[in-house]
């Protein structure tokens, strides 16, 4: 007989087999079911020193587990015990051989995948002990792997995704409906083990190793986390989220956890299914595990990955119907807070994009929940560094306009206004609120006049402006209080402050509209917040024409916004002081601020209209935005010619319009008393004077519907009340007596009602306010005395200029004040005085070498706009400047005859006649000759020289005074083609020239002709 050859096992297989107890001792190895410690140490030592043998060990272990898993599900307890020991061996190998984990990664994942399929014999449920050990091995693998094989090795990647899918299914398992006695603890244990496995994948390098496979992984990880999160009560969510902020541990059931570091220093957490005698996990533990896993994943994301996670959140909510608005908002807020600081802006931005993609239809839960989520994020304490405030605002405003076009009373509009208002909660740069208001003003200016929803759009956007100021003011106060810089409360009687109304005087009549003074005890200063700059008056000035809109709801909404601006944003001016020793402002001189702005087009007066109708007239349309302008377009001051044709009684000023105007004027005299007196006193005198001359109704003139007599009386009430306030605040007894006498001469009750008290707490968007009409005047004519001013203007002026307080505030003597207050006032002159014109010949920069160098550079570029720079003239094309010099047309005064109206830039006004001026009204330049200038222009044209910004005369007619020669610019963009004004040429010629160019803006600025 031959000898049987000796077949010894390979060393790695022998070391592996030695780790198992003898077959007869397997059942007694419980409940720990651990491998033999000494032999396990030999195996790990062998594998560590011979990494090349790890692949063979993995293959052998894979064969054993495949057999053990199948037998364990069939009820063989020995194989189940052997399976548990095999999984413990695998975890030990993963932990000790972490540097060479890639050598047996494929076998490792197959072992884990097979183990997750083990079921309890005859019950069919998940074997938690086996799954727990498999999850522990998987967590060890995800902890130490670099993830380079995921996405490269197709077999490994497929197995890895299958494991994630199985964990995801276990994390959402429900055992409550599977039996008569639901086992909540068993369900919670199952979910916790599965969530532990998902947490391992979420914190692993493998999830971020492949850009292509990242979306596939989060498709398997995010939904189970969200399911468990949304199943929790809102109180549990808040409590567990607060715990996350204090404790970085992934879960109370995940032990031995350490923050991610170098592979050699990492530690993989261990798991257990249940310890005898220990109370089972609660639903709060499951919620905590889900939130911590989500927190761990989000903390490591970049902007692209965060955006993809938000998309999965939206997809999850789409699947579940957006039914839990409160939880939706909470999750959105927490997700934003957990994303790295520099990427947080992606959450509100992406949610707004989702809203923009929705169809315009009746609001659905998705509309309301998504919008509430954005608002919650913007109002939360979480900072959104990098948020594109203007871009987000543009999207929200576009959505508002779309919804209004869909339905004027759309249920989504209040939420949209609140969302826009929330942009004022956090300040990310100093001029943020200025930019928001400016953008809203721009969008209002873009609304075409043909838009049927124009008035409602303007009203809603105006509510957005008010909402932004309300939210910003509240946030400022909160920030100041947290810093301990509480704003001191002003006292009613501060030394040097204006005397409170009616102090030491007879009480006002009960019918006065000043029953509840709005600005009686304002804060001594406006915002001095360290967070931001207050809204600039130059920015707010762009919105002022909304006071003249034809729709009452727009006027009333804007009036409230203007009052709010004066209360919270307007910088307080110097306070008048009766004696130099008294308190108050340190500066006694009120210097008017002349800021650069955009000019308005002025035309000749509308017949029968007066300057008083800047308050009582109705507004017209706002022109569309012109992209050729580099500066923001102003809303033009407009008035409809509604004195004979009224579509509604509120097309002219109503009693509540006068109440709003009274409040605004009262606020101005409280906030900026010196400036308000200087600009307001001439206006009050002119309004009182012109009301008697212009607002006259004669029998048969067809103006019964314009409420002429009622408006005249309301104007006189307003003027008298404002003068009385001025007298109270400046301590001028003579004016107070005169105003009270005038009020006593008017029949009671007053036509101006008390101004409605604003809602408290503030409502961001309410229904449009309903106008109230005057009571029709029964008289068909008036006596000649009513055409005179109600107040004696000479007496008023005399008392005003003799006031020592006024003289001290202006630092002017009586004669200077007389010249200041006695000037002729008009709307156009007031507008001109409120801003600097870029093209004004009197407003040129001082000589500067840098400026002259820039001048030479610009002139060398054949830029004919010499008026824009200062310096020596260079050789250039004859242009409009030379012709204007020759014509003496550089006139910067505005006609003060009558009260010219402010026309729109709209094309409907282009057909109207432009203002004409007589030959005698022009200043002729003695040093220039119009004919010579025209010859030079024609000479350039004949030579074929093209002046890009010069003027080219097409034809000149010798004609009568009624004929004119048309001119056009040589600019291809057609700058200055509209709004041309007529100048006077040489004898027998009349030339129509462009208005002066506003060269900083690259467009013409309309200069009204002087009469």
From Swiss-Prot:
Record gene name: EFR3
Organismal lineage: Eukaryota, Fungi, Dikarya, Basidiomycota, Agaricomycotina
BP term (GO), one: protein localization to plasma membrane
Polar residues composition-biased segments: 576-592, 609-625, 910-922
Species the sequence originates in: Cryptococcus neoformans var. neoformans serotype D (strain B-3501A)
Span list, region Disordered: 478-510, 571-636, 892-927, 949-1011
Pfam families named in the record: EFR3 (PF21072)
Stored SUPFAM superfamilies: ARM repeat
The organism's place on the tree of life at top rank: Eukaryota
Similarity comment: Belongs to the EFR3 family.
Biased segments, Pro residues type: 489-501
The protein's name in its UniProt record: Protein EFR3
